[in-house]
Amino acid sequence: MDSPFPKETISADFCVVGGGIAGMTMALECARAGFRVVLMHDRPVPGGNASGECRVQISGADRLGKLPNLRETGILEELRLENCRINPNGSYSVWDMVLWSALETEPNLQVLYNCSCRAAVMAGNRIKTVTGWQTTTQKEITVAAKLFADCSGDAVLAPLTGADFRVGREARGEFGETIGPETADRRTMGMSCIFQTRRCDTPQPFEKPAWAHTYCDDSELPCGADGHANLHEGYWWVELGGECDSIADTEALRPELLKILLGVWDHIKNRGDHGAEHLALEWIQFLPSKRESRRYVGDHILTQRDIEAGGRFPDTVAYGGWTMDDHNPAGFRSAALGEPVNIHHPAPSPYGIPYRCLYSRNLDNLFVGGRCVSVTHAALSSTRVIGTCSTMAQAAGGAAAIALRRGISPREVGQRHLAELQQLLLRRDCYLPGVRLELPELAHARISGTGSTSEALRDGVTRVEGGALHQWRCRPGDQLTVEWDAPQHFRRISLIFESGMQRRIALVPGNPDCLRLPPELAKAYRLEARSEGRWRTLAEVSANARRRAVHPAEAPFDALRLTLLETYGAAETGLHALLAE
């Protein structure tokens, strides 16, 4: 019997399944390169675990701001700075709108919201189409594309396409890891539901629902009395699912997580002196945020040993730096077992992540991103955090653009065009440990400027690194001039500014740095070009909110001049790069 529901087919160059931060970043990078991209997402808002539906803070190599100058840049920095600009009250709905707007305003990108991927059609080892069910329209939507990517978290395309994948913890001996169990198993890190609170002027009573659990003593909780350090955004250790099937058992686990969550809040309010008399529940997470389920197998599987060695790969295209934060599969139950709920195994920051982890080893046109990339369980305990996922996804999005432009496979990008991909990412303000930006446009240019030395603009590093600033330091009124002996024909000029990389700008309750633009960021500046001895203005900016600002350049010129006019409060700032393309 034919379905009574309507069907629609869409053609695209690239189809990304899953619209969390990874899927968004990958889709945007490829779409901005001029290719037609469709993003299929099963929720009404983008952002995944980082959205207002789940509110997981975006962690990464800077370890919640504890390690300066390691914050992820590129598209993620663009999104976070825009949130700083328009969200002075720290609203998660406004953050959702920042993410929505980034997708909505990209002309080459079509987003299918509330559309859950449920089928795929193969032609040998290539995906031809994927099909999703859109709940709001009761429509079956099929997307035909040249390339596909799975950023769904649960790796939904793996069982639909026959792509190789893994589930669970590897045995220690398989890759020489020390974190895993002696014998491989299917246990994973679990999923969590959190809450957020609001401080009120008057005492706020709380009556526990009859169906919620009761916890009379701190010893019944995974972190004991120490687990209540932050009453405003707790708690990640309300976690289950690692001992079950973290996909199939989700709906059975969700009510249990809510019983635990409200039981913990009852304990805080009514069963001990936790300083919560004036706190009220503001928000409860009803959609659990997952850490681990399926993981694809690529041409390389990143391991604990790789991370500990610093990830020194010739095909480094992304980086991480979170500790190997391995969660006990028992989750909340670990307290009853007398076991730690998690262990932070040491990891260097930053460490490189190779391109070979970002595509399927047995399908010819499938990229992977987010927490389902090609890593072991031990390595995933570090790479799973959202900031790290964004760096891998932007790399895959750039690789997709190269593959489409050249008509090649994801694997061939790494085999034949790796340097092109690395330089593309560096020019998009991504950071690759050990890889320097090549600047042929400045090779024969003369650079001069007031303020500190401007020669740092030639060194190919676009952030503070190893104690070196790698920037032209300047104060309002200072000027930088770049001159060539002959007229140059460039299409655009990109400026990469200092953006307070020592700060933590992720949206987190109680974090003042996420409520305003960094004082170090250039607010106002003028960019001019010289032709036939006359200066003309390319851009006069009065309210910049970008670390990477791009300006078109049409007519030929033989000099550029940048004048810093104002910062967002700092006495001085810096310019890391001036790129002419």
Task: Place the predicted regions along the sequence by residue.
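Flavin (FAD/FMN)-binding glycine-rich loop and adjacent Rossmann-like elements that form
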Residues: 49, 114, 118, 126, ...
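Conserved N-terminal/central alpha/beta ligand/cofactor-binding core
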Residues: 3-7, 11, 29, 35-36, ...
